[in-house]
Amino acid sequence: MEKYFAPSELIINEDGSCFHLHLKPEQLADRVILVGDPARVNTVANHFDSIECEVSSREFHTITGTYQGKRITCQSHGIGCDNIDIVMTELDSLANIDYQTRTEKKEHRTLTCVRIGTCGGLQPYTPTGTFIASVKSIGFDGLLNYYGGRNDVCDIKLEEAFKQHMHWDPIKGAPYVAIADEQLIEQIAQDDMVRGYTISCGGFYGPQGRKIRIPLADPDQNEKVEAFEYDSLRICNFEMESSALAGLASLLRHRAMTCCMVIANRYAQEMNTAYKNTIDTLIVKVLDRI
């Protein structure tokens, strides 16, 4: 029996678009570039040879076009894993649910999703300007723990090793380790990118060890994170979305990964706010390789 998705669960707008993104099924390409900043969608689309459509709703800005013969959708997601939950669920629904019958399509359509973002470097070999590809992402946000099958797509041994190393306080909720698509990593992350682990935090300040006016629950968090090593790789960076992206993509049978440019190095306490021109280099690399 076909699974029917009720209007209260899968919300479809009157114009036939998905609830938050306001995107219609025919407007979605198989290749998707994800960016946090809605304005960065235009930066990506400036490289397109042609523009097919443009849609904006709240922080979700979409442009679909072509680049060197490849049809690509560039989608902004805003900040945080909670927004990735919205974006990935709705993109998957556009690809794999018939909006007319509200039932799952018989043939699965696989999306290839690459997030281009900014991050904070955590190692001496990740100074500002470094491009980092997230091989595995440790989610501090807890989002994937709400979905069935999370253990099937996560690195449980790495999770346990990390919790033991950190003396993890269970009051924070269990971290999860999501795995990027290995073939996509090989395709995108070439010699000009550092491969490593990433931590996706549930916030920008306290969760990333920034003490402004409120004391930190674990003042030694970042030092412990920087020292962690597993299977010859270290945690290279902090950001706020890659774990949810990799985890949800795995559960939904899509291909996904994140590559970020370091704009702050927490180890060296350096920051580069004038990064917008430099990130264009990373954008072109991803466009060429996706």
Question: Which residues fall in each region the model found?
Answer:
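Metabolite-binding pocket within alpha/beta catalytic cores that recognizes anionic/polar moieties
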Residues: 1-176
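Polyanion-binding loop/helix "lid" in catalytic or ligand-binding cores
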Residues: 175-180, 237-244
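Glycine-rich beta-alpha junction loops
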Residues: 120, 137, 199-206, 244, ...
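Short pre-catalytic strand/loop immediately N-terminal to key active-site residues, enriched for Gly-Thr
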Residues: 232-236
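Short glycine-rich, acidic/polar surface loops and turns
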Residues: 239-259
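Active-site rim beta-loop-alpha module in soluble metabolic enzymes
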Residues: 157-230
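Intrinsically disordered, low-complexity segments enriched in small residues
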Residues: 20-27, 202-208, 280-289
